[in-house]
């Protein structure tokens, strides 16, 4: 019984770790974002958007 409990705890820890690290679908490089938006005479900013269970860090020009 104790072995089953330990396996269950380890499984939950690994599952949580994958959920946290695996949810980010894209990264935003702030310097590249600002450079791209400067060409449009706008300010660049990295924003976080969610869709379903995924988190996107996108570059937006304002």
Swiss-Prot record:
Signal peptide: 1-22
Keywords from the UniProt entry: Disulfide bond, Ion channel impairing toxin, Neurotoxin, Potassium channel impairing toxin, Secreted, Signal, Toxin
Disulfide bonds: 28-46, 33-59, 37-61
Cellular component GO terms, alphabetical: extracellular region
Localization: Secreted
Function: May block potassium channels.
Protein name stated in the entry: U10-buthitoxin-Hj1a
